[in-house]
Amino acid sequence: LSLENTSALSAELPAALPYVLTLGAALCFSSASLIFAQFSRRLSVLWVNTVKALVAALLLVPTIAILYATGLAPAVAPDLTSLGLLALSGALGLGIGDLFLLDAYTRLGVSRTLILYGFQPIGLGLVAAIFLGQAFPLGKLVAVIFLIACLIIFSLERYKESGHWEIKGLLNALIGVSLDSTGVFISRLAFDHSPELHPLEGHFIRCLGALSCYVVISCYYKSRGEPHRRIRLLEYWRSLEPTARRWILLGCFGGTYLSLCLYLTAVRIGHLGSITAVGITGPMFAALLEALIHKKRPSRYLAAAFVAFMIGFAVLLLN
């Protein structure tokens, strides 16, 4: 696959832009994850995932229409290869992967689950170097090491607090992270195959892929005589009070629509391994928000993680 068009686009943009976009995406996603975890415990993981994919898809329709009307994006239909790749990416990463992740949220907590994203940059960076021809210089590797150090610090803190890891929750988190990484890589393949494709168009196709996956899962439960495990979209929605409805909609807007719009834009124009490294700062944001919500004073572990993050981010921008 040729990267000439993508490289040319990246050369015209500020070098720090992909990292700023990824940082914003991480903040949106980690904040929304706290909301998703609460409603997953209260209702069901399948329901929350369906709602967030549906809300994102509905928001993307007018957004893409505005892009077409203003000429910011060409109204070019993606070819079947890119369409299939993005749908597969949505089904695996945004669909099945998020089912495992949200289940892990309910078992391990948001911060602990997001810690496992620390193992994502090395794998994705190497895959990108092998299959996409992207360089992975020593400077970027040093930055990734500092960024992963943030998560090791958080991991140590959580282990000292609990003394153990829940095996099922840990396995679900690992599976979710792996599927999410696969989805990110497939999305990049689709964008490289169709450079004219706008990230929001890709995000919309991914949402449709995820929704299709959820419908299949729901039908599977029905065929097995387990109707209580189906999506039950309207039933659960009607059971929520107005305040709860506003919170879940806010989480869907920030965590699925805005965060992935920012992240897919960064994936399209930036270095895949480095972008993923910045994206793993989500646990830091989640831990900060949890501290504010529960009115707990930030620990020395949090301060140390921030120092490691700032050093790694500085190295990243200099390379």
Pin down the residues of each PLM region:
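Hydrophobic transmembrane alpha-helices of multi-pass small-molecule transport proteins
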Residues: L60, L126-A129, L138-R158, Y301-N319
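Transmembrane alpha-helices of multi-pass small-molecule transport proteins
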Residues: A26-I35, R42-I96, F146-A149, G202-R230, ...
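Hydrophobic/small/kink-forming positions within alpha-helical transmembrane segments
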Residues: S30, V61, G90-G95, P121-L126, ...
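Glycine-/small-residue-enriched transmembrane alpha-helix faces in small-molecule transporters
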Residues: L1-W47, L58, H164-E201, S212
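Structural motif at transmembrane-helix junctions in multi-pass transporters
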Residues: R42-W47, L99-L116, S194-E201, C261-T281
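Hydrophobic/aromatic residues within transmembrane alpha-helices
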Residues: F39, V48, A104, L116, ...
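Alpha-helical transmembrane segments of compact multi-pass small-molecule transporters, enriched
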Residues: V55-L59, L116-F131, I145, L208-C213, ...
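Loop-to-transmembrane-helix transition segments
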Residues: L17-A25, I64, L72-I96, F100, ...
